Swiss-Prot record:
MF terms in GO: ribosome binding; RNA binding
Record protein name field: Partner of Y14 and mago
Biased composition (Polar residues): 120-134
Entry's family note: Belongs to the pym family.
Lineage: Eukaryota, Metazoa, Chordata, Craniata, Vertebrata
Length: 194
């Protein structure tokens, strides 16, 4: 965007402009030789200047558009060797896939095998159901026993600390001590069942 300069008898000015919010900027006096920041050319080192001055096409090539040949070679020109090989492999697979689709193969029908006896299957299913019902229940009761023993051990430790005067029990701890008998009974019941 070029800055609008106004020149009158007292010198050169940047004209007053309106801001986006509607307020006005004051006109500013500009000294002779001042170049606004937007119009200052960007610094370019030698390397950048060299490549900008260098022609894009090799010498002897016409600037007019060259006649286009097949699209695949132009695509492959920028690819590495492995990429080219991969493209060839994909093309071969496509061609082979098209050939197999065009020539449907006749596959022999699988021979029917005699079905197993239904009684054997029902017996196997019953055994599976029995083992499944015993498995998780046994593990569940073992886990429950372990947890009850742990809770009972914690209650006994708490009781010893209270009796020795080391700890003044809170309401929650007193409730825990009151549940000790119920924990012992539940532990005895589980041990009797397992």
């Amino acid at each position: 965007m070029a800055t609008p300069y106004v020149t009158d008898e007292s010198g050169k000015y940047i004209a007053a402009t309106q801001r986006p919010d509607g307020s006005w900027r004051k006109p500013r006096r500009v000294r002779d030789g001042y170049v606004p920041q937007e119009e200052v050319p960007v610094y370019e080192n030698k390397f950048v200047k060299f490549f900008k001055s260098k022609p894009e096409l090799p010498p002897g090539v016409c600037v007019e558009t060259p006649p286009q040949t097949q699209t695949q070679p132009s695509d492959a020109a920028g690819l590495s060797r492995t990429a080219k090989r991969n493209m060839k492999r994909k093309e071969k697979r496509r061609q082979q896939g098209q050939e197999t689709k065009s020539e449907p193969e006749l596959q022999p029908e699988p021979e029917l095998q005699p079905e197993p006896e239904p009684q054997g299957l029902s017996q196997q299913m019953q055994q599976l159901e029995l083992s499944a019902s015993q498995g998780p229940g046994a593990a569940d009761s073992a886990r429950r026993l372990k947890n009850l023993r742990k809770k009972l051990r914690q209650v006994e430790e708490l009781q010893q600390r209270v009796l020795s005067g080391e700890l003044k029990p809170s309401q929650e701890q007193l409730d825990k001590l009151g549940r000790a008998q119920a924990l012992r009974e539940e532990l005895q019941q589980l041990e009797a069942h397992s």
